Amino acid sequence: MTDALAQVELLRIDHVGIAVADLDKAIEFYAATFGLRCVHQETNEEQGVREAMLAVGPDAGGPRLQLLAPARPDSAIAKFLDRSGPGLQQLAYTVRDVEATGAALRARGLRLLYDQPRRDTAGSRINFVHPKDAGGVLVELVEPA
């Protein structure tokens, strides 16, 4: 194992993101069908997205399901829905230090979407690995607030 490999420390799966056209209908569907509980909702004005975090099972602290709906037609989620339709949009991992993890991944030749981490849901700091460098999967790195 190289030094760069040793520096990447993924702590757990944080959430799986699903793009939806209607956030309220999707929350209702996942609650009624699978018994998931909505534990957080917010609108990210910078990204143009409405989002909800749904808890899976009795442990609200475990991995979550994130529902993402466009808040405006020019958002990345709106473009994703236009291109691919509703469905899986991202896989997110919890990391201790998003900057250090990003630097280690860049050292391996992977591209990140942002030069510097950005603030996101509930004050977390995030960055994304470009899907073309991660087998077609948009990988999100989440450093909790």
List each model region and its residues.
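N-terminal beta-strand motif that seeds the catalytic metal site of vicinal oxygen chelate
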Residues: 1-25, 86-95, 144-145
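Vicinal oxygen chelate
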Residues: 2-8, 52-53, 93, 99-145
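Short Gly/charged-rich anion-binding patches and loops
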Residues: 25-26, 100
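Conserved active-site tyrosine of GNAT-family acetyltransferases
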Residues: 26-31, 54, 105
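Short secondary-structure junctions
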Residues: 35-43, 110-117
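Conserved short beta-strand elements that form part of the metal-binding/catalytic scaffold
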Residues: 37-82, 122-145
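Charged surface patches that recognize polyanionic ligands
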Residues: 70-77, 83-90, 95, 105
